[in-house]
Amino acid sequence: MSKQVFETIFAGKKLAVEIGQVAKQANGAALVRYGDSTVLSAAVMSKKMSTGDFFPLQINYEEKRYAAGKFPGGFNKREGRPSTDATLTARLIDRPIRPMFAEGFRNEVQVINTVLSYDADASAPMAAMFGSSLALSISDIPFNGPIAGVQVAYLDGQYVINPTAEEKKASLLELTVAGTKEAINMVESGAKELSEDIMLEALLKGHEAVRELIAFQEEIIAAVGKEKAEVELLQVDADLQAEIVGKYNADLQKAVQIEEKKAREIATEAVKEHVTAEYEERYAEHEEHDRIMRDVAEILEQMEHAEVRRLITEDKVRPDGRRVDEIRPLDAEIDFLPKVHGSGLFTRGQTQALSVLTLAPMGDTQIVDGLDEEYKKRFMHHYNFPQYSVGETGRYGAPGRREIGHGALGERALAQVLPSLEAFPYAIRLVAEVLESNGSSSQASICAGTLALMAGGVPIKAPVAGIAMGLISDGTNYTVLTDIQGLEDHFGDMDFKVAGTREGITALQMDIKIEGITPQILEEALAQAKKARFEILDVIEKVIPAPRLELAPTAPKIDTIKVDVDKIKIVIGKGGETIDKIIEETGVKIDIDEDGNIAIYSSDQEAINRTKEIIASLVREAKVGEIYEAEVVRIEKFGAFVHLFDKTDALVHISEIAWTRTNKVEDVLAVGDKVTVKVVKVDDKGRIDASMKALLPRPPRSEKSNKEDHQSVRHHGSPKDDKGKEKYDK
C-alpha cells in the first residue's frame, strides 16, 4: 500500500493520519500527528487461539525521551521500564478497547503506541488512543470498533476539549472520556468538588467530541480498511451445555444464593468440583478430553454468571441479600497503629483497608521527570493488594498495573482537598494496605485515607468518601447497584467508582464490559452514588468530625521563615558551607525554595527556634532609626567603625560622636568600647552610617557655638567625608 494521508481539524489543532508508509508488517498501523505530537500505533494478532480462559490483550504506551528533546537519566542512558504515567496511559487506552472484542475471542492481540514527538499542548495519550483504535480498525483483526477518547477541562464556566497545558492548570476538572459512536464506555476523572450536573454535562460534551473523531476514523477505514480475518471463538458444545444445565443448574443456583461470601464460595466450588470430577472420569480417555473439560469449566462459569444476573434483574435480590441501593455494614477507626503519623482502618462488609500516613520535609518529594518539564510531586497515594486479602496465594512483588491504577485513583480523589503548600509545607504519603477484599477495595482505601489524614492533623478542606456502583443490563432493562461486591463486579456490566465530599465529586472512574451506557444510566448512577457517599461520610464524621489541630508527636514539626531572594545565597553559603554548618549545629532539616521560603523541620521545637534565630541573624539588615548596642572595632581619623551584629558594621563619623566638637576620635573612643548607636543612613550599596550623638540630648546653643558648629560641619563635609567613605569601602 502506498502512503495515504488523511487530515482534519479537531479542537483547534490539525489532526493528520498517515497510513501505508511505516510499520507495514503489522496487521495494522497508523502514524498520528496531532499538533506537534506524533504517535505510531501498531497492532498485531497471534495466528492461533491462546489456551487461557481470558482474552490476552496487551496495550503498551512507550514514552521515548527524544520525543521531548530529553536525554535519558541513569547509568545506562536508555529508556527502561515504563513510568507511572505511561502505565496509567496504557490502562486508559486498554479499558475502552477491551469490551469491543467478541465474547469468546482468545487470540493474543498487542497494540504498541510509541510517542515519537511530544507537544504538551496536544495530547499524546489521546492521539495514542485514536491511533490504537484506528490501527485495529483498518487491520484484519476482528475488532468491533472504532472507539475514541478526549480530555475535557472546565474553566470559567466553559468546557474545553483537549485543553492546553496552561488550561489544564487552571481547570477545575481533569476528565478523560471514551466511547463508541453510540455510547460512553470509559471515564477517568479528577475534579475540584464539582456537582453531579456539571460532571454529567462534561461527560456528554466529551462524547460529542468522541463522535466527531469516530466519524473521521470511519472515513479512513472505508478508504484503507482490510477485510476481517476469520478466527475461532471459544464456544462450548451445545449438547454438553444442555446436559450440564439440566442436571446441575438447581444445585448451582442454591449455592449462589448463599449470602455469606466464604460459605457461598465453598458451596459453589463444591458443585463445580463434583461436576468436573464426573466429566473427567467419563472422558478421561477421549481424544478431545482437553476441549471437553475446557467446555465444562466454561459452562459452569456461564451458569453462575446467569444466576447472579437473574437474581438481580428478576428477583431484585443481590447475592448477599441487600437491596439494590443498600451499602454493606460500615465501620471506621482511627489511631489503629502507634508511632506512625496517622492511621485509619475502614471496613465495608468483607472489604477492609488500612491507610497509614507519613509526613516528611519537602526535600523528600518525588521528582517526576517524564516528557513534560520536571516537577516535584508532593502527595503520593500507594495501594497494595496482597493475595491473602482474598484468601488466595499468588504473585508477590512489585505493584502491577492494577495496583498502580487504584493508587492513582485514590490520589486524585484525596489531592483535591489537601491544604496548600504555604499552609502545610509537608510532603505527604499515604499507603493503603488492603487487608480484606470483596469488591470496592479502591474506594475503601479512599475512606481509610481520609481517616488517616484527619487523625494525623493534616488540615484537609473536607472528608472524602468513595463508592463503587454496578450495572446489570440485558439490553432493554437495567438495574444500577450501590456498593458492588466481588461477584457483582465479576458478573456485572459496569464498575463505576465515584469519590467526593459533601460539596461535590473529586474523582470518577468507569469501566464497562458492554459496548456503552446511556446518559440516563450515568445520571441514575451518579445520583445513587451521591446518596451512598453521604451515608459513608456520616460514619467517618462520627469517628472524627474534623482534622486534629496538632500533628502526632512522632511527626516532624515545622516552622517557616521567609528571606529576600537575594539573601538565599547568604543562607546557603559557598558550596553549601553555611547551611551545612547550621544543620550540623542544630540537627534540623532545611528546605529552601526559589522564592526565599525556608522550611525548618525537626521533632525538637528548640532546635527549630535556634535555627530561625541563626537564619534571621544571617539575613538581618540594619534599618534607619534602629538602635544597637555596638562595639568599637576600628578607629580611623574620620570616625570609628562599630560592630552591630554578625558580619554587619557601621561607621560613626567623627562629627556624629558628640554634639560638641571632637578633635580626635581616640580622645573619646577605643577599640572594644561598648556604645549605643542609632542608624541614620543606609545607602544603595548597603553602607551604614550610625550616630552616637543622635541618642544624646542636644545642648542649648549660643550664637557663638552655632557659628562654631556650622564651621565644624563644613570642616567635616564633602571632601573628607568622601575620603572616609572610600576607606570604608575597602
From Swiss-Prot:
CDD domains: KH-I_PNPase, RNase_PH_PNPase_1, RNase_PH_PNPase_2. Its cofactor is Mg(2+). Residues 556-615 form the KH domain. Mg(2+) binds at residues 489, 495. Gene3D superfamilies: GHMP Kinase, N-terminal domain, K Homology domain, type 1, Nucleic acid-binding proteins. Residues 625-693 form the S1 motif domain. InterPro entries: ExoRNase_PH_dom1, ExoRNase_PH_dom2, ExoRNase_PH_dom2_sf, KH_dom, KH_dom_type_1, KH_dom_type_1_sf, NA-bd_OB-fold, PNPase. Its EC number is 2.7.7.8. It catalyses: RNA(n+1) + phosphate = RNA(n) + a ribonucleoside 5'-diphosphate. Residues 691-730 are annotated as: Disordered. It is found in: Cytoplasm. HAMAP family: PNPase (MF_01595). Belongs to the polyribonucleotide nucleotidyltransferase family. This is Polyribonucleotide nucleotidyltransferase. It comes from Streptococcus mutans serotype c (strain ATCC 700610 / UA159). The gene is pnp.
